Each structure stands twice: as structure tokens, then as C-alpha cells.
Amino acid sequence: MTQSREVLNLLTLQTPSPSGGPRPCRRYQLRTPREGCGTVMEMMVAQRDHLRVSHVSPFAVSLQAPDRWERCRHGAPRFRLALGKGEYGRVEAVSKHECVKTFNEVVAFYHELVVCDLIEIARLRSRCPEKSEGLISFVDACMPCKQLFFPRYSCSLNDFSHWGPENIPPLVAGFESLLDAVVFLNEECGLFHSDISPCNILVERAQTETGLGKLVLTDMGLATPHTGNPQTGVSFVSSGGTQLYQMFVDRGPFMVSKDAYKPACVLLRCFRVAAALNWGEVKTDRFPICQQMSRVIDVSCLGYCLLNVIERILDVTKAEPTNRFYSRCSFTELQPQYFLKCLVHKVVLLEFLADLWKVEGGGLSIGVSSGAEFDSERLSLSERQDFRSWCRQLDTRYICTLYPYSNLLEGCEGLRDCLVNLLSLDYFSPFGRKSLES
């Protein structure tokens, strides 16, 4: 295989079909709701307030907005409480139970609006809508104001700080629900989230001040259709038929997930491509992601979010050893070593947990050891030496700050099993553990 062909394969986030060619598009049929979900007439009435198909071609579909979105119906709120802001715009509480997300750019607004409503339509048609409880509900939209309305939550998982033993059982239950949500997003919505991190997981208010409430996946601003859909091209049109937005669907490994939560299979692709090409060439080649790779990446990102929480449980002194380790990193995304270094905290902490919990059979192995043994990749001597040195440096930090509190995790079989399950698809090979089966 030529180098250019190999790089193209790495940039294409698709698993090979049994024949070796591209995977065919999978076609879904609308399923009637399960008993107890209402009659077909009720479903049709409910769908009146959602997107509808206005045009279909072999490769694309046009989705039309309902009339209600195009009218401003909400009025001025009685109060506004700022909850967050970013490049997209701002989020404000407008009541005790509701918040509004106001966008600066119409493109970002249309994108998230379409994705959120596709999820709501999937709930309407699902036989198991309870599997979507870990996905944020979309309440309403106002196109003139570029606003989306959502339920209000207490904080993000990134900001939650009460990590006592009493919150470990609800943590496990929360991540099991998030796993159901990601599978629902993948199989029933036909969507790839692509940006799962603790910042994008919200915490519902619990019965006590320090309790951990229900966890919900949010921020669909980068979610896109995968190739399991009959059409991947999606355009959004007004109720009058005017095209408002053409959804982006092409994805590449460099623009998938925040680096701290990038799965090992994605980091390998980034490492190989960055070593073979210059950055300008890399950024131009992107392709739609297949359903299997979408699942591998989103589920694995959930696993690394849970790993982050486990570190915070152990970090009793708030030393933040991982953040401090990476704050001294001198590499940039232009260098392949950067992506190797993004593996270090995953490898070191997973090795420690595998030993602590007596995990057998490589259940927490991602194909890389802190001794710089790579199961499916040949590195140069200097690269292996650097990786081994980085692992020793971080392990030294953990010895001082995390490991003395390992008793907090003893007996946490549910937490162990949840982490093993979430990381069961990831491996330092192009397609995750699937590569090992080929």
C-alpha cells in the first residue's frame, strides 16, 4: 500500500467491510411505537411540531421547519441568570426549570436545532424511548431570536466537586445511562456526537446539596449523521422552502473529540498522519464517518470521561497532577509526538487501576504499556524512550498525589466493570479492538 493511500485510509473514519470495500449504507424503516407509547394518530399530531422531509434524493434529504419555530412566541423572560458563554453565544436560566441557549451565528444555531429535533423525532418513533433518558431534551426553538430552550440542570460534570464514596453508585448508574444514550444516538438517531467530555455532560440537581443527580449528554453543536443513514447530505429549509443551511458531515481524526478524551484509535491515526504529511494537507481531507467508528469513538470518549472522574475521586488534595503534567508540554498539534503524549495519562492510570482492581485478560489495556511496548505500532527508539520517560514522570506525580488514596476505590466492582465496558472498543490501532479481530 502506498503512503498516500494509507494516509487516506487513516483520514477516513470508516471500518472496512468484510469484502474490504466501503460499507454499504444501511437503510432504516420507521417502526411503530411500542404499546403504551400512544396511537399512530397521536404520533402524527406530535410530529406536526417537528421537522418534516420536503425533498429526497439518492444522497441528500431536505428537512423543513415547522411554522411554530418561525414565530417568536416566548416573550421576554421574567429574569435572566447567566449560566455560561462561549464562541457559540450564551446560556441563561429563564426560570427555575428552564434555560435558553442564544446563538451568535445562525449556522451554529441551525445545526444544533436540526440535530436536537432529530433526537426528539427518534424518541417519538422508538420502542425503547427510555434508552434516550441520558440525552438532553429539546423543549422549543425560536428562529427569529436564534434561541433553543432546554431543561435547566445544576452544573456540568466538569464542575461537580463532591466526590465522596456515597456518589460512586449514582456515578456508575449515570454512566450506564449515558452509554444507553450514546447507543440510542448511534442506532436510532443515526448521529455521531463527536465531542463527549465532562463539560458536555450535565448533572441534574439531587435531593441533597452534595448528591450526584442524573447525568445527561448535551451540546449537539458538532453532532453529524454517520453513513448508517440512507442519505448523509442534510439541508435545512424554511416552511416556505428556502434553503437556510447545508449540514456539514465530513469528519477527520484531528477534529474529533477534545484531545484529553480522544480514544487511542483516533490518536494513532493522528500520529501516523502527522508523521507522514504536513498540517496544511491534513486539514483538507475529511470524509463521512461510518456507524461502527462513530460508536467506537463516542463510547470510548465516555470511558475517558469516567477515567477523568476516577482521577478526581483520588485527587483528594486537588493537586491536579494530569493538568500540571500537560501544562509543561512543549509539543504542538503540528508534531506527531503531541499525539503520543496525549496517551500518557490514559496508559499510566489504566495500568494502576488494572493492578488495583485485579483486572485480568487485558480488560483495561489499550495496546500500549508505560514501558513503551506498543502492540500494533512500531516506533523509533527515540520515540519509545520519550514515551517511557513521560510515563515515569506522570507516574511519579501520581505516586505523590493519587495513589495514597487508592483505598477510596477498593470494593468498587461496579465502577470497575463500568469502566472496562466503556473502554472495551478502544485500542491503539486504526479501528480500535475491531482491528484485532481482522
From Swiss-Prot:
Top-rank lineage group of the source organism: Viruses
InterPro entries (alphabetical): Kinase-like_dom_sf, Prot_kinase_dom, Tyr_kinase_AS
Domain Protein kinase: 77-340
Family stated for the protein in its record: Belongs to the protein kinase superfamily. Tyr protein kinase family.
Domain notes: The protein kinase domain is predicted to be catalytically inactive.
Gene name for this UniProt entry: 36
UniProt protein name: Probable inactive protein kinase 38
Species per Swiss-Prot/TrEMBL record: Equine herpesvirus 2 (strain 86/87) (EHV-2)
SS bond list: none
Molecular function terms, GO-annotated: ATP binding; protein kinase activity
